[in-house]
């Protein structure tokens, strides 16, 4: 089967690991011919070009900046991406035909492109639902429901669902939400934020070097948050956790990431002057994976205002590494149901700091701490292996 995969991520090096890298590589491994269309931002010196990576054709498309820019510019530039992708596909892929077109949200602005490609190739269309926009922006009060920008993006969202033959959501709540708020005719299924299994083992010498480099106390438990630091993660709540982290016994907090509020988080840590709190900018993946191996408990944060069920992708690596999960999210995300029902962690709503402190201390003292670790890995093994998820996807498309 010839597969066209459209994404906003930069997938130039498919020898790397990640949600989308592994997704594309597993399709290729199963014998399908995959072409990736991937963004290349202007600020990074992006150029439109067709390359081969790990045996897969990758069409890099130069786009205007959609990261590290203002909210307005990001919105305008996102609307323009469809035009850039259409032009590049016509120029570089005009002699090809595809049986299946797979695309992700974000963005929701590819409806015309997908519709045209679907007609041209008589292809099946599959949406990987990773984001429910524009409702998430309404939840965070970035704009109002009666605004023209909301109406514009909402129309595009509806059209994208309408032209999709199949929709794979990250969790049951994802699928339920779009069905309850839209007319969905597509076949639906759960496709997790899945990855190949990694070996999260760190050699003793590497452990010592990392401990010294970061400046952590090896006698204390490490709570790790890694990922984006922006409005969706509930920055004020994260700062409240930092302010009261001294109430968590014999522990240290390690925050690694980037985003619009990284400097805010970093500044707050400096004001607190708590030697048990470290804030670092984003690390290379191989080094960050070693930090995961070194840590004891993985943290998940989401803003409590969300009415849409987000499902952070950073959970996957933590489960794979067998790390108990302490999650503070909105009540609509079913990440809480997965970690609680599978005995792999604890949850509280992210407007309750007392309960977070209580859960953290409870987890540390629990006789079941080792069981939490074992259950975390078992949840990865059951739900988050890329091989199983690609098999599910291909089975649905074949029927």
Range-by-range predicted roles:
Residues 351-355, 367-397:
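A charged, aromatic-enriched C-terminal amphipathic alpha-helix characteristic of glycosyltransferases
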Residues 40, 173, 194:
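Carbohydrate-associated surface elements
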Residues 248-250, 256-257, 262-289:
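Nucleotide-activated donor-binding/catalytic signature segment of Leloir-type glycosyltransferases, i.e.
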Residues 48-51, 201-216:
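A short helix/loop element that forms part of the nucleotide-sugar donor recognition site in Leloir-type
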Residues 14, 233, 284-291, 298-319, ...:
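Nucleotide-sugar-dependent
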Residues 1-57, 245:
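N-terminal subdomain of nucleotide-sugar transferases
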Residues 4, 217-233, 238-242, 254:
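Conserved donor-binding/catalytic core segment of Leloir-type glycosyltransferases
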Residues 109-112, 116-120, 148-167:
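Membrane-proximal helix-turn-helix segments that form the acceptor-binding/catalytic region
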